[in-house]
Amino acid sequence: MIQRPTFFTPTHLLAMLLATFVLITGCHREAKKNADDGMPVEHLYDKAHTLMKKGNWAGAEVSFKRLIAQYPYGPYTEQAMVENAYAQYKSGKHDDAVSSIDRFIRTYPTHHNIPYLYYLRGLSNSNRDTIFLRKVWSLDLSRRDLSAPQQAYNDFKTVLDRYPNSRYAADAKKQMTELRNMFAQYEMNVTLYYLRRTAWVAAAGRANFLLETYPQSAFQYDAVAALGEAYTHLGNKTLADNARQVLQTNAPDHPWLKGKWPKYPAAIRKLNPFAGEKSAATGQINAVVDSN
């Protein structure tokens, strides 16, 4: 019996071509995915470290994580964990960096890189959520929740207290000073809020708190001026004169002495929740905030 030849319709041919393409693509992806499988740990580390030196933070993070997954223990793994946290920090993934650092500190509490990791955690905490705010709204960072910056301050303090001779101690101290100024600015913001609303007692209380908690901050003389303003309106001439004398001695150019401080924004500007007030002492912008 003679069999008739089989003919493929265009539909059959297209289906076969698609199936072949999917098979080839899948094999290629699998080969690419497993390219690093079985690679010696030192080669994996060199690859990740090279990516990091080139500024390819995302690629470095992927490679470091692959090394850690394949080789959970050992000196290369420990170094990979440290550098992975740095790559996450440089990528702006500050929450991930803090998580990686915390995990390392719990696992290797006596590691020689612990001072560096506390320092890096301070940098990560001080930058949490700030990049987006700066780029989108240019918000005054002293207006936001201060829990992360406060944790950053504690991280830098740990470096200074526990590892005073480490190479990170000097910059940790500098970072602490900058954070203290930000905390002081937050208190100044609230003080200005109360002054503008003629809540003189509350304004004086907040200004005193600033001076007691953050002495020598960049906003100390603004706080003294706020005390002078509040006590003047409260009719306490003695305390108002004391504030005036402090300014005349230490900040004789402060505009409050000439009746030109504080300057409140125009009524239409008050409607803008992101409007700010300039510090007479520093020229910085003090954003207006509602107190808790």
Curated annotation (Swiss-Prot):
Respond yes or no to whether keyword Ligase is given for this record.
no
> What coarse category fits the chief subcellular location reported for this protein?
membrane
Cellular component annotations (GO), alphabetically ordered: Bam protein complex
Per its UniProt record, what Gene3D superfamilies does this chain match?
Answer: Tetratricopeptide repeat domain
Location(s), subcellular:
Cell outer membrane
- Quick one: where's the N-palmitoyl cysteine lipidation? C27
User: Which PANTHER family does the entry mention?
Assistant: OUTER MEMBRANE PROTEIN ASSEMBLY FACTOR BAMD, SOLUBLE LYTIC MUREIN TRANSGLYCOSYLASE-RELATED
Q: How does it sit in the membrane?
A: Lipid-anchor
HAMAP family reported for this sequence: OM_assembly_BamD
Which protein family is named in the record?
Belongs to the BamD family.
Point out the coiled-coil segments of this chain: none
Report which superkingdom the organism of origin falls in.
Bacteria
Q: Where is the signal peptide?
A: 1-26
Which UniProt keywords are given for this protein, alphabetically ordered?
Cell outer membrane, Lipoprotein, Membrane, Palmitate, Signal
Q: What is the name listed in the Swiss-Prot or TrEMBL entry for this protein?
A: Outer membrane protein assembly factor BamD
Q: What does this protein do?
A: Part of the outer membrane protein assembly complex, which is involved in assembly and insertion of beta-barrel proteins into the outer membrane.
Q: Where is the lipid attached (S-diacylglycerol cysteine)?
A: C27
Q: Which organism is it from?
A: Xylella fastidiosa (strain 9a5c)
Fill in the subunit field for this protein.
Answer: Part of the Bam complex.
Q: Name one GO biological process term.
A: protein insertion into membrane
Q: Which gene encodes it?
A: bamD
Cite the Pfam families for this sequence. Answer: YfiO
